[in-house]
Amino acid sequence: MTYLDRILEHKQIEVAALKKEQPRQRYEELQAELEAPRNFSASLKRPANKGVRLIAEIKKASPSRGLIVQDFDPLAMAQRYQELGAAAFSVLTDQQFFQGSNDYLRQVKGAFKLPVLRKDFIVDALQIFEARLLGADAILLIVAALESSQLRDYLQLSAELGLSALVEVHDGAELDEALQQGATILGVNNRNLKDFSVDINTSIKLRPSIPSDMIAVAESGLKRAADIDAVNAAGFDAVLIGEGLHISTELRSLIWT
């Protein structure tokens, strides 16, 4: 069983518990009481003559690396990343595999003005309603984790709720699927979710196949200034970086604004 298989199997258990805790109808009723989401999509648009925008990830651990940040403080981390010039935050909410928390997202959203992406593995529409209630401005939809009909329906639902959707792909077939189902923000994950191996050439090879009017995001494995130069030259609008910002003084020294 792959990493992704194990994660998705556990997500189904989480969703079953979520449905018992609060039915979809109640989530739908609560939407009217919320403030409008911040514009995640607009925050990623690359200004003329500027470099890629930074989505800074608030991440404590991962299945492949274990604990990444010993003294984890999501607000302190977000503050550092905002000072670096981040355009948006990505907050891990998966608890079982990444030691994330819904509370981390709430805290970051409440303390800062930047748009916030809920980074999790969505397998059910109820998780999208939940993301909206948590204060997320955007969600992650992983093509490898969803059927075609799910991807299409979840893109439509997120739009109805005012949420941006970062649609993640890893190869050409997944990219074609994302485009066919109506994605407008494309994330190319350099990490293979089956075995968690990383190759940053994945994003560079796929970039020419992403329409120029879409927002293109390079994700995972970016740890050196040379990596940023490469995806910058390839024409990406933004990068999503978590562990790299924590461990690399090179990345932290770059000018992101």
UniProtKB/Swiss-Prot annotation:
Matching entries from CDD domains are given as: IGPS
Does the entry feature the keyword Lyase, yes or no?
yes
Catalysed transformations (reactions)? 1-(2-carboxyphenylamino)-1-deoxy-D-ribulose 5-phosphate + H(+) = (1S,2R)-1-C-(indol-3-yl)glycerol 3-phosphate + CO2 + H2O
Q: In which pathway does it act?
A: Amino-acid biosynthesis; L-tryptophan biosynthesis; L-tryptophan from chorismate: step 4/5
- Entry EC number(s): 4.1.1.48
Key words of the record: Amino-acid biosynthesis, Aromatic amino acid biosynthesis, Decarboxylase, Lyase, Tryptophan biosynthesis
Which top-level enzyme class is recorded in the Swiss-Prot or TrEMBL entry?
lyase
Q: GO biological process: any one?
A: L-tryptophan biosynthetic process
Q: Which GO terms describe its molecular function?
A: indole-3-glycerol-phosphate synthase activity; phosphoribosylanthranilate isomerase activity
In terms of InterPro entries, this protein maps to: Aldolase_TIM, Indole-3-glycerol_P_synth, Indole-3-glycerol_P_synth_dom, Indole-3-GlycerolPSynthase_CS, RibuloseP-bd_barrel
Record family assignment? Belongs to the TrpC family.
Looking up HAMAP family in the UniProt record yields:
IGPS_B (MF_00134_B)
Name-wise, this protein is: Indole-3-glycerol phosphate synthase
Natural source organism: Chlorobium chlorochromatii (strain CaD3)
